[in-house]
Amino acid sequence: LDRQARTTLDIDLASADTDRLRLVAAAEPEEQTLDVALDHLQELASLDLGDYFSFVIAKSRELATAPEGGLRCTVECRVGGRRFTNFRLDFGLGDPVVSEPEWVASRNLLAFAGHEPVRIPLLPTEQQIAEKFHAYTLPWHDRANTRSKDLIDLMLLFETQTLDQHVLKEALRATFSHRNTHPLPEHLPPPPDDWSSEFAEMAIRFRLSVSTLAEAYSYLQDIWERWELGVA
């Protein structure tokens, strides 16, 4: 999405293949699947690629939002042995991925040091949209839903990306079924009215084709119905 996208404060990693982690954990009586996942992350972070960067996972805690658990880690990035910055990394286990990852090339920030851009696998756009719809429709029984940013992200993705309708339907079915928090809705529920002001501000900032919350809901509801996204 380039400069039109919402910026993020963390890096999200996902692993659909939890069987191997469970096998390793089962072989070690003291190990749990999340412990094995953390060990694997530490091992990957310690790889020396000859670029003078190193990464240390300083601390972690369990993340309950992933279907089979996850970790939220604070990672310290060092350059030439000195601390450069810290960032947050969320690692989730068990989300289904119904199509091949999308590979993108990073910006060539280290060209001055003779390093080529790296290629990064991303979750398919349809999978990202399915997870956004899941978060958007998730019932918040104990407090008000404040995730207006999910609606912004959905608008940006639908307006800027070429999508496969059938892959999106499959991703929605798989995500709602696997997470098993609430049913895939037949009709898209409207957003809370108190999102209106914040949404209008973000709609201008991200140059959406709509300017109001009602227009955004109408846009997404139309796609939901035409593509029959709520039909299991």
Regions found by a protein language model. Name each.
Residues 2-6, 15-232:
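Structured mid-to-C-terminal alpha-helical surface segments
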Residues 12:
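Glycine- and aspartate-rich repeat motifs characteristic of hemolysin/RTX-like Ca2+-binding segments
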